[in-house]
A protein has these predicted regions:
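Expand to "…catalyze enediolate/carbanion chemistry for C-C bond making/breaking, isomerization
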Residues: 1-224
């Protein structure tokens, strides 16, 4: 494993700002909150009719401006959707710091993304490990394969995607989030064993600062 990938495993990940890739105004202002990572999303937040536009806008933003935070692009899954391979073809040459692979269920899916990154790095003469991978666990199958996934090529971080995971469990959102406890602990243990970063799920209620604080204190107590 490259030195750059090893360094990326240790990078600070206190906060990640999600912005939709089809909204240039939000992409351009993503830095103002000082997040450690800027994640441009061309997956769930972008309608099917705007996938091509979001892909091109995201690539152009990565090429034309310097973000202060670490840059991450959440692509569409290459084997679960018809958009993922096109995402890789356009986004990887734009040189984000990381590709986020959503709905990861098997290490073979990570290998597909890693292979494309390797091809682009070599073609451009970039050092190995210039671009790395963050995986997202969003299903029961992914959770049960999490140890192998964490050891996948170029994987430097892992996150929990709670909404799809809840749907796979056939449950809903609760307070406290008892339905996420097993997943959070399992992902945390796998990440610690693999020596990679671990990132909790999104807190989406921007009107509940007290709830946000309680959630942060809880996951910190778990070991995040």
């Amino acid at each position: 494993m490259s030195q750059l990938t090893e360094l990326a495993k240790k990078r600070l990940s206190r906060s990640m700002m999600f912005v939709p890739g089809n909204t240039p105004k939000m992409i351009n202002s993503a830095d103002i909150h000082g997040a450690d990572s800027i994640m441009i999303d061309i997956e769930d937040s972008v309608p099917v009719t705007e996938k091509d536009t979001a892909r091109l806008l995201t690539a152009e933003a990565l090429k034309s401006r310097k973000f202060r935070g670490e840059t991450v692009v959440r692509i569409n899954h290459p084997t679960q959707t018809p958009y993922g391979y096109d995402d890789l073809d356009v986004i990887v040459p734009a040189k984000p710091d990381m590709i986020r692979l959503p709905k990861t269920e098997d290490v073979s899916e990570v290998e597909i993304v890693a292979k494309k990154i390797e091809e682009v790095e070599k073609a451009n003469g970039w050092p190995e490990g210039t671009i790395n991978i963050i995986v997202a666990i969003e299903s029961v199958r992914g959770l049960y394969n999490v140890r192998e996934i964490c050891h996948g090529p170029r994987v430097v971080a892992i996150a929990l995607g709670a909404e799809d995971y809840r749907a796979d469990l056939r449950t809903g959102k609760h307070k406290p989030a008892v339905e996420l406890l097993f997943a959070r602990q399992t992902i945390l243990h796998a990440a610690r064993e693999a020596g990679i970063r671990v990132i909790d799920t999104v807190f989406s209620d921007v009107k509940d600062p007290q709830g946000f604080r309680e959630e942060v204190e809880f996951i910190k107590a778990l070991g995040y």
